[in-house]
């Protein structure tokens, strides 16, 4: 029969999976938003859900630390959970930032560079894989997420060069900067996915 402590750790596991699923959802929605889908309010609502879930998990972690005496491995799991939810919360914030930028992009009929769409797909994949790595305790998947970040960084650098050239030609400066910031937020989301993968790896150190 599971102890109260074991049940709390299992609840922590379930809550992180739930928060991770919300992050996957909000990133997929932001990807749709930059393509013109009418889902901006849904992004904002999902970001609020992520914020609420972060507070719930923080409270659970504090209860575990205050009322239990976790051994080293369990303590690592709780510490990693606190780091992971911080990164997940930032993913929600950056998806909301992308949603804000997508309003101007859509209203002004700005053409989205193909590479931004590809970058969005890469970051969606990284977030999904980082959550899957946690669920499956898969260290190989953690390493894949970390390696994939190089491709996202390369794509961001290419986008910077492409937008600089387009702005030099005839692209409106504000439109160019909004597209650049959209790509920058995606690059940061990739960084947060890497942080989550690293937290998962830390949890399962022997």
Where are the regions a protein language model picked out?
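Secondary-structure edge/capping motif, primarily at the C-terminal ends of alpha-helices
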Residues: 27-37, 61-68, 99-106, 130-137, ...
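A structural feature that tracks compact, well-ordered secondary-structure segments
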Residues: 85-103, 130-131, 142-146, 153-160, ...
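Hydrophobic/aromatic-rich structural module bridging two neighboring secondary-structure elements via a short loop
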Residues: 63-86
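Amphipathic, well-ordered alpha-helical segments in soluble domains
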Residues: 19-29, 53-60, 94-98, 122, ...
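A cross-kingdom feature marking solvent-exposed beta-strand/loop segments within repeated
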Residues: 67-74, 108-114, 171-174
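A positional/architectural concept
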Residues: 2, 7-9, 13-51, 58-59, ...
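Conserved amphipathic alpha-helical segments that form helical-bundle/coiled-coil interaction surfaces
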Residues: 39-63, 77-80, 129-163
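Conserved small/polar residues in nucleotide/adenosyl-binding loops
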Residues: 203-206
